């Protein structure tokens, strides 16, 4: 007999009075004085569990069923019947229950049926998927990943894998993880007593990627519409609820596109993701709303129904300088916006999702297209209430002389970008793109404020367990 999932039963794909097999784990169990046990079993296919009715005439009732505790894995054969208390719900009347895995010493089981804080669960990343809250986050994450691919595929985008190991510093920052096979006790030095990277595995300095953007630009300049989707790494020594050392990004590049084109695409991508989550994960969203006491569904619907508010960087600075709020960092033109500035604009001033455009060139990456004023670049950041920046994008500098000027101004090593310069030397084309941080998006959708709760195995400063 082929086993069925609980989601199939709930969605009425399996009909009553039919003998079925299910596999799952015990959530809770209670025994009645009449010799009947009520076992709530879940299998992860949905938030809901199914109640299993186990009677004392089962051969292993005393030896096994009465000993069941939260977390035990079971295989159950039985007949589906409508609940006497609620005719819309099915119960499984067991004819056979096999215990596949016991919980050794239930009193020491870290993920018992009692409530646990999210902070506590972070110490048990390998076991926390067994909780309702992390199960809901996982299903939502899955739908978000699926919809990213589905949306872009329907728009004619081609997926291009970008390298994890790179010799490039895409963002021009020093916060990169170095990749090396050197024995720390025997690091070779050159004649200047500096590390001799020529003797390393790749013959040069290499890093874990902070972005796949530069690589997929080369494919956009021949395939027109491309994207990459994978993990990225930042060696930021920031032990906050907003930062991860390893996180997932979807990065999109489009040939012949301008800034407004990618802003519209980014908004439509987010809208479609939210629609899909509302459609596929409604029960999980309702559960999270009650658990966290926040209004998630209304928030997602508001984004879908309201257009992005466009704000020039200069206007954002004016608003922040003239407001009565005392910020930790006092702003002036030419400074980057911190999270407190972003949150003020999206949460308090506009009370909506916004996009800030045309930033000073000094605070943005070397590859962004210089505007006519020679002071700003054609860049845009989309901010969401409660989160801040969720998407960052720009027109890419397609003029070789301007690109060279910015490489020099940012004090980057010119020879490392020769291949990138080739894209401007041989049939250069206007193009634009953006990056979307998936974990921040999941944090927004689920309402979980700590980004470490929305990725299976979080990596951060001083934390690389599991």
UniProtKB/Swiss-Prot annotation:
Chain's gene name: asnS
Disulfide cysteine pairs (residue numbers): none
Predominant localisation class: cytoplasm
Alphabetized GO MF terms: asparagine-tRNA ligase activity; ATP binding; nucleic acid binding
Name of protein: Asparagine--tRNA ligase
PROSITE patterns noted in UniProt: AA_TRNA_LIGASE_II
Family, per entry: Belongs to the class-II aminoacyl-tRNA synthetase family.
Species the sequence originates in: Wigglesworthia glossinidia brevipalpis
Subunit structure: Homodimer.
Gene Ontology cellular component annotations, sorted alphabetically: cytoplasm
BP terms from Gene Ontology: asparaginyl-tRNA aminoacylation
Keywords: Aminoacyl-tRNA synthetase, ATP-binding, Cytoplasm, Ligase, Nucleotide-binding, Protein biosynthesis
PANTHER family cross-referenced by the UniProt entry: ASPARAGINE--TRNA LIGASE, MITOCHONDRIAL-RELATED, ASPARTYL/LYSYL-TRNA SYNTHETASE
Location of this chain's protein in the cell: Cytoplasm
Enzyme class: ligase
EC number: 6.1.1.22
Gene3D superfamilies found in the cross-reference section: Bira Bifunctional Protein, Domain 2, Nucleic acid-binding proteins
Catalytic activity: tRNA(Asn) + L-asparagine + ATP = L-asparaginyl-tRNA(Asn) + AMP + diphosphate + H(+)
NCBIfam families membership: asnS (TIGR00457), PRK03932.1 (NF003037)
